[in-house]
Amino acid sequence: MHATLREIKRTPEGIKTAQRAFEEFVTNSDFLLPREVVYTGCGSSHFLSQPLAMATTRLGGRGVALPCSELLYSREYYPVGKPELLVSISRSGETTEAVKALESLDVPKFALTAYESTLSRKADYALIVPTHEESVVMTHSFTAFYFAFLQLLNASFGLETYDAEMTSELTREALKNEGYIREITGEFDFRNVIFLGSGILYPIALEAMLKMKEMALFWSEAYQTFEVRHGFKSVADEGTLVVLLVNEPFDWHEKLTKEFQGQGARVLTIGNGDTGADYFIDLPKVDELLTPILHLPIIQLLSYYKAIKRGLNPDQPRFLSKVVKW
């Protein structure tokens, strides 16, 4: 078994690891997250910073997310405001831009990482979630980091935290779709893929796009669900797979599905309710902030099996390294 597939399958275990890391943090520190937070990261870590910023805003604070390089060199173009905390995210804790980003704002610094590292040592606070992935690409650590920090957000804002055992079991159930995903990639040799998501699922669509590029070296795009109708849909035809990430679909999702099918594309809907798609993966209804956790292992499996279909080794993605440094 490839290390990448093994790491995807560790998602349920990663949720439990995340819960232990959260509990250890709150036991050893009385720190509470403030209301105004800037999140930053690179690549997958940036796409992780986006749902964390959205969750902060949804829970009553104000979250802003931007890539480390933009925070370092172009932040005057972003609504950074007057944050009370900077959260820098890096799986290794050694990513050059993530470490340098800690110095970009004169506010308390927080590291979200998997290791005792340069990042954690330079930060004022560190939430270390020891996922210690073997895979080059970020897989279950994305989900674990998100869950651990979501727990900290809830606790800091005086809200009830999520049931880690239940969440872990839900990801285990999601992973049971592996065989169906393998069937889809075997049956339909799509030549491009478009990922769609709204709200907190939009950055998950972006992460899905990146996973497809990293693992399968494959052309993929991502858009806000209904924004795709405004020009972008022109690239979809009989060789296209459209992956619709939804929580609870409504009539617009069904209309969009038919629109793409009318262009010859096939649609895979992932969520709590079918849209009349060619393929459908049914997920249970959960709190909206938990939906990324259920979608992530599925889109990772889709990218993995597309890579296998193309005869590639997902453990050795071209031109990529586990830690990115200048």
From Swiss-Prot:
Optimum pH is 8.0-8.5. Induction: Expression is induced by diacetylchitobiose (GlcNAc2) but not by chitobiose or maltose. The keyword Repressor does not apply. Pathway: Glycan degradation; chitin degradation. Its EC number is 3.5.99.6. GO terms for molecular function: carbohydrate derivative binding; glucosamine-6-phosphate deaminase activity. It catalyses: alpha-D-glucosamine 6-phosphate + H2O = beta-D-fructose 6-phosphate + NH4(+). It comes from the Archaea. Signal peptide: none annotated. Catalyzes the reversible isomerization-deamination of glucosamine 6-phosphate (GlcN6P) to form fructose 6-phosphate (Fru6P) and ammonium ion. Involved in chitin degradation. This is Glucosamine-6-phosphate deaminase. The lineage of its organism: Archaea, Methanobacteriati, Methanobacteriota, Thermococci, Thermococcales.
